[in-house]
Amino acid sequence: MAICNIIEDTNRTDEQYELINKQVRSSGPVPPEGCRLAVLGREWAITVWDSAEDRDRFLAERLGPAYQAMGLSLDEVTRTQFEVETLVAGDLAGMAQTAGSAT
């Protein structure tokens, strides 16, 4: 079953946020394998994953190392997850896609 993962991180600086995003984007495909939706902001990342295993692999192999490179830890963020029963989205084809964002 799909899961929604919400990460809240109010402790990073704008510079750390940009550098983390840059490292994540350069370390593999965007969106990451198994990620169906990502809504990103400086303090929040809301993602929908095919499985907890896909999410955990991304955290361990890409986001965790990007945090560590900044001297930060994912242990310091607030994480919430829940099972997704229904996901409804409008036509996203016309939405702006920012080159500097990923989680």
Annotated model-derived regions:
Residues 1-46, 50-65, 71-103:
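Short S/T/G/P-rich N-terminal loop/turn motif that feeds into the first structured element of a domain
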